[in-house]
């Protein structure tokens, strides 16, 4: 079975010319059939993509040849099916959105802890262990005895800290996230708030699951990932989860037994939150997905994406022509 290389990458660096990087980066991704999304902002680059070994190597070489992006941190895993449908490079205000001005992990950040040393740290009764991910991610798995802030977005994390953590009481805080980038900001934020001993898992959960044997692991469950695999376990093996196409949150076999579950339309988490018009649209989409499967096609793939881009280009050309006529 064909294997796809999945590459999660990020780097905090001052990119004053980040807008200029979008076009050449997108061109390289399209030329090498790299799918996924990369975010560019003045504070750096972040994203997860997938391709063949050759495609990912071409991307990494491009990053190394771009002086400001040389040394970009990346982690690789594999997927048996294409985990992404589209190719995107987006310009953003932040590469990971916390919404707090002035947080700069390049200057202030917590202490990195290697996966091999993580168990000893979080087993210390004096260390408060905090999962910085969103609640729906934590539901699939987390470290033993870790606190769940029950946030819906990373923007809510600073409020959780203000309401629940105290630098005078919590002398040692250890935090973790999927690949490490959220902890770059969360540990920087805690340091700015006066917490002295702040630690985070280097390389995130993914690096831990890759390097720490299951028999020695303190991880319980699976790790949610933001692609078609949905979740991975020890050794980064793909887990048996699916995504609800209505709310884009993970669904379990137990969820599928619920009366509130309708394939491609609703799950227990989003049931009752969509209008009838939206539900009908979801049902029609699910119908098209199933028809595409019967034909042995992808509902949204390279050909569909290319057609969308072609139509978009034609639309822009028509608008430009109209403006020219008016001028």
Swiss-Prot record:
Keywords: Oxidoreductase, tRNA processing. SMART domains: RHOD (SM00450). One of its GO terms (biological process) is tRNA modification. It catalyses: uridine(34) in tRNA + AH2 + O2 = 5-hydroxyuridine(34) in tRNA + A + H2O. The active site is at residue 177. The keyword tRNA processing applies. InterPro entries: Rhodanese-like_dom, Rhodanese-like_dom_sf, TrhO, TRHO_N. The keyword rRNA-binding does not apply. It is an enzyme of class 1 (oxidoreductase). SUPFAM superfamilies: Rhodanese/Cell cycle control phosphatase. Residues 123-217 form the Rhodanese domain. One of its GO terms (molecular function) is oxidoreductase activity, acting on paired donors, with incorporation or reduction of molecular oxygen. Its EC number is 1.14.-.-. Catalyzes oxygen-dependent 5-hydroxyuridine (ho5U) modification at position 34 in tRNAs. Belongs to the TrhO family. This is tRNA uridine(34) hydroxylase.
């Amino acid at each position: 079975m064909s294997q796809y290389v999945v590459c999660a990458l990020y780097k905090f660096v001052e990119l004053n010319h980040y807008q200029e990087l979008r076009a050449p980066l997108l061109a390289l991704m399209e030329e090498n059939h790299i799918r996924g999304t990369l975010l560019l902002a003045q504070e750096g680059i972040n994203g997860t993509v997938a391709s063949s070994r050759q495609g990912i190597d071409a991307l990494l070489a491009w990053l190394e040849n771009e002086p400001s992006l040389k040394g970009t941190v990346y982690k690789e895993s594999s997927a048996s099916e294409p985990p992404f449908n589209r190719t995107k490079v987006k310009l953003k205000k932040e590469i990971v959105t916390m919404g707090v001005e002035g947080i700069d992990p390049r200057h202030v950040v917590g202490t990195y802890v290697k996966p091999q040393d993580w168990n000893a740290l979080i087993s210390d009764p004096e260390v408060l262990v905090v999962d910085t991910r969103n609640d729906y991610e934590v539901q699939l798995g987390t470290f033993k005895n870790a606190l769940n802030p029950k946030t819906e977005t990373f923007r809510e994390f600073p409020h959780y800290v203000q309401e629940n953590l105290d630098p005078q009481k919590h002398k040692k805080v250890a935090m973790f996230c999927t690949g490490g980038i959220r902890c770059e900001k969360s540990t920087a934020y805690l340091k700015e708030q006066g917490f002295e001993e702040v630690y985070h898992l280097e390389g995130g959960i993914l690096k831990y699951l890759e390097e720490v044997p299951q028999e020695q692991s303190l991880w319980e469950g699976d790790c949610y990932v933001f692609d078609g695999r949905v979740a991975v376990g020890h050794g980064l093996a793909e887990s048996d989860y699916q995504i609800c196409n209505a709310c884009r949150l993970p669904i379990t076999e137990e969820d599928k037994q619920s009366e509130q579950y309708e394939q491609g339309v609703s799950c227990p988490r989003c049931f009752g939150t969509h209008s009838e018009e939206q539900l009908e649209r979801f049902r029609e989409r699910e119908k098209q997905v199933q028809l595409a499967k019967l034909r042995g096609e992808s509902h949204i793939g390279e050909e569909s994406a290319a057609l969308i881009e072609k139509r978009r280009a034609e639309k822009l050309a028509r608008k430009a022509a109209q403006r020219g006529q008016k001028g």
